[in-house]
Design a protein with these regions (language model features):
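Short, acidic, small-residue-rich periplasmic hinge/interaction motif at the N-terminus
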Residues: 21-71, 299
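Gram-negative outer-membrane beta-barrel transporters
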Residues: 413, 511-519, 536-637, 704-706
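Short acidic/polar hinge/loop motifs at secondary-structure boundaries
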Residues: 108, 117, 124-150
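Transmembrane beta-barrel wall of Gram-negative outer-membrane proteins
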Residues: 178-180, 185-214, 219-257, 284-295, ...
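Membrane-embedded beta-barrel scaffold of Gram-negative outer-membrane proteins
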Residues: 195, 305-318, 452, 458-468, ...
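Extracytoplasmic beta-strand/coil segments of soluble accessory domains associated
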Residues: 47, 51-52, 59-62, 79-124, ...
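Conserved C-terminal beta-signal and adjacent last beta-strands/turns
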Residues: 236, 395, 461, 494-496, ...
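Structural signature of Gram-negative outer-membrane beta-barrels, strongest in the C-terminal barrel
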Residues: 248, 345-359, 382-519, 614
């Protein structure tokens, strides 16, 4: 298998295929190798091009989306922003924020929220101690850059997951105008308003962003509301130390339409699951969320930097579902110390990163019977605890001016504990005590290289191990056997990856990764009916003995024509026509499984292509028709007897920026053919409600004004 991978990469180096770059961007300049030690830049204040140079030090698949790429679309969820990043499979569940996210087959079991991908905020982990997280609390318009580390390539931040990491770099007072106003509106009752201000006062900088989002929804019972507040205050001390405090507040309310059967999807994709729409159930998810984070960055010398971050977040969740009303209160806190030393080693360029992390989560987990969406009779009352301690290190040594060797690893100790406070939950008030605890210990090594094959071309590769203990919600799911947290083993994976990236002048850019991941004990969600004929399912998790994920991630940015307007007498030079494309091949399979032999793992297509043809005029006008296609449907159950349907959806975007006034407008049309297709899926649903429809034909527009 690896010989085949090496052959593919050798061919790719000889005949480059391509990667996503921002439109009309200058050709990337790969980071030069220098023997002199250099100070590592501050991610919060580093310019975008410097961030791109930094991320190209990673010996694996990576990408960066800058502020322009964020703001030129609706930017309601990560699919809006990362649609042209190969290898990232993002599917909105019912229109707006909440999405299924899978990178290299991570989180195929997800039919809600996020797992298998580390979410980072400004380089530090975001979410709970067990790895559970979501993106609904984060506002993309308060973000100046999104960095994607695909697969086991996020060790520089302590990442240890199959899917890698998505790092959102948020704005500070250095990044915003005195006044920034943005308003968006569109189909299905979509409205989004954003007001922000940022300013620098000597050594102080302040940023404040306020966002209001409302959506009636394409489907019945899918209306949503978000209120977000984000603020950041920083202070630079003499000597270069920076201290920064960030504060987030979110109020979220959303109704849940649920999944459909194939006949329901064909007849009326706008309908909701009758069980979720039932007035006696009122399936919904409402919460309040608060997060405070303090970071300190201190230069110890010209080549050494010490970073410390700590955060506390609180969530109060009210979550009516068919089988229960979940009322949870969750507190999570973390602290991390990271030392970066870029001093030369034996007259060779070198960078050493060492980090120590601690995460803790405490959760009051109560379930009640559901009466019209309100809690009635208590059926579960637990105090759940998760702790994680991680120690990681990565060293990048420039063996020659053109070749960098990378070695590293992460040691981790994790615990999961349940303290049952509701003992009389058996027949006839029999005491069922579900209290239990379990721990996990691991070491995940990593080795890789980056070879600078030319001034603007790289070849890279790595062999990396990842380790993911089960989440609390997987150990305590209503479908699990009670009183034994040790049913689920941690998921282990060994990744082999080779790739190449770079550019040929300004005409061509490419990014190609080929990977083979061997997995043991992959965690899979089987959604079972709690009793025969039940109109709903409950989650039950199991380990798959052996599985394999292989794939190809190929991106392209090709300059087709430039200065066309000048040639035909329609304007000055500076216009350009570019073709950008992202292709993902994914083959995720069981390996000699006792039940499913070598079937496909459900949840992701073999082939996925998205492409955009974009014209930029020197006046500030741009126009970009696009297409995405899944040419063959993919399986949604492990038996491989149910699958989605193939689809092709076309859309278009256009906009205009009037720089003297700092005024920008955009317009977007999606699914212009009004094609009915599946956006996300509920895998292995016993009631065969697998399909969550994509939105029909939709139009969106927005206006933004900035005053410096």
């Amino acid at each position: 298998m690896m010989r085949a991978l090496i052959a593919v990469i050798a061919l790719a180096v000889a005949v480059p295929a391509v990667a996503q770059q921002p439109p009309a961007a200058p050709p990337p300049k790969l980071p030069p190798v220098v023997v002199e030690g250099t100070r590592v830049p501050d991610e919060r204040t580093a310019p975008e091009e410097q961030a791109r140079e930094e991320i190209r030090r990673v010996p694996g698949g990576v990408d960066v989306i800058g502020e322009q790429g964020i703001k030129e679309s609706r930017a309601a969820n990560l699919q809006d922003v990362l649609g042209l990043v190969p290898g990232v499979w993002i599917r909105p569940r019912f229109g707006a924020d909440e999405s299924q996210i899978s990178i290299r087959g991570s989180g195929l079991r997800n039919n809600f929220h996020l797992r298998g991908v580390n979410v980072l905020l400004d380089g530090f982990p975001y979410g709970n101690a067990d790895g559970f997280s979501d993106f609904e609390s984060l506002e993309l318009l308060d973000t100046k850059r999104v960095e994607i580390y695909k697969g086991a390539n996020a060790l520089r931040f302590g990442g240890n997951t199959l899917g890698g990491a998505i790092n959102l770099i948020t704005k500070t007072g250095y990044d915003a105008g005195l006044i920034e106003v943005r308003s968006e509106a569109g189909s299905f009752g979509f409205f989004k308003n954003h007001l922000a201000t940022g300013q620098v006062y000597g050594p102080f900088d302040l940023y404040l962003g306020l966002t209001d989002v409302e959506l009636d929804g394409y489907r019945d019972h899918s209306d949503q509301m978000r209120r977000r507040v984000y603020s950041s205050g920083g202070y630079r001390l003499p000597g270069g130390t920076t201290v920064r405090f960030d504060l987030n507040y979110v109020r979220s309310q959303e109704n849940l339409p649920g999944a459909l059967t194939q006949p329901e999807l064909d007849r009326d994709p706008r309908r909701a699951d009758p069980a979720n729409l039932n007035l006696r159930m009122k399936a919904a998810r409402d919460y309040d969320y608060v997060r405070g984070a303090l970071t300190v960055r201190t230069p110890l010398s010209e080549t050494q930097t010490l970073e410390w971050g700590t955060q506390l977040n609180y969530q109060d969740l009210h979550h009516p579902l068919s089988f229960a009303v979940i009322d949870d209160t969750t507190y999570s806190y973390s602290t991390e110390l990271r030392w970066i030393n870029a001093a030369p080693l034996f007259d060779h360029g070198n960078r050493l990163t060492v980090g120590l992390q601690y995460f803790g989560t405490r959760q009051i987990d109560a379930n009640f019977t559901n009466v019209a969406g309100a809690p009635a009779v208590l059926t579960k009352n637990q105090f759940n605890i998760a702790n994680t301690v991680g120690l990681y290190a990565e060293n990048q040594l420039d063996v020659t001016p053109a070749f960098t060797a990378i070695v590293g690893g992460r040691g981790q100790y994790s615990t999961r504990e349940v303290r049952d406070r509701f003992l009389r939950d058996g027949p006839g008030d029999i005491d069922f005590n579900d209290s239990d605890s379990v721990d996990f210990l691991s070491f995940s090594p990593r080795g890789g290289f980056v070879w600078r094959a030319g001034r603007t071309a790289q070849v890279y590769g790595n062999v990396s191990h990842s380790y993911e203990p089960p989440l609390l919600l997987e150990l305590t799911a209503p479908g699990q056997l009670q009183g034994n947290l040790g049913q689920l083993a941690a998921q282990k994976a060994l990744q082999f990856e080779l790739g190449t990236r770079g550019s040929l002048g300004k005409r061509l850019g490419w990014d190609l990764s080929v990977y083979d991941i061997e997995l043991w004990d992959e965690i899979q969600n089987v959604n079972v009916q709690p009793f025969p004929g039940a109109p709903f399912t409950i989650p039950r998790y199991r380990n798959i003995d052996r599985s394999r994920h292989t794939g190809v991630e190929a991106g392209a940015d090709l300059l087709l024509i430039e200065d066309l307007a000048r040639r035909v007498g329609l304007g000055a030079a500076g216009d350009a026509l570019r073709l950008r494309a992202a292709y993902t091949y994914s083959r995720f399979v069981f390996v000699d499984d006792v039940n499913f032999d070598n079937n496909d793992l459900p949840g992701a297509p073999r082939h996925f292509l998205r492409a955009e043809l974009r014209y930029d005029h020197a006046s500030g006008f741009w126009f970009a028709p696009n297409v995405e296609t899944v040419p063959h449907g993919y399986y949604v159950n492990s038996e491989n007897n149910a699958r989605t349907q193939a689809y092709t959806a076309v859309g278009t975007r256009l906009g205009y920026t009037y720089k003297p006034w700092q005024l920008a407008v955009f317009f977007e049309g999606r699914n212009l053919g009004n094609v009915t297709y599946t956006s996300s899926v509920v895998v292995d649903a016993a009631n065969r409600r697998f399909f969550e429809p994509a939105d029909g034909r939709a139009f969106y527009g927005g206006l933004e004004w900035r005053f410096r």
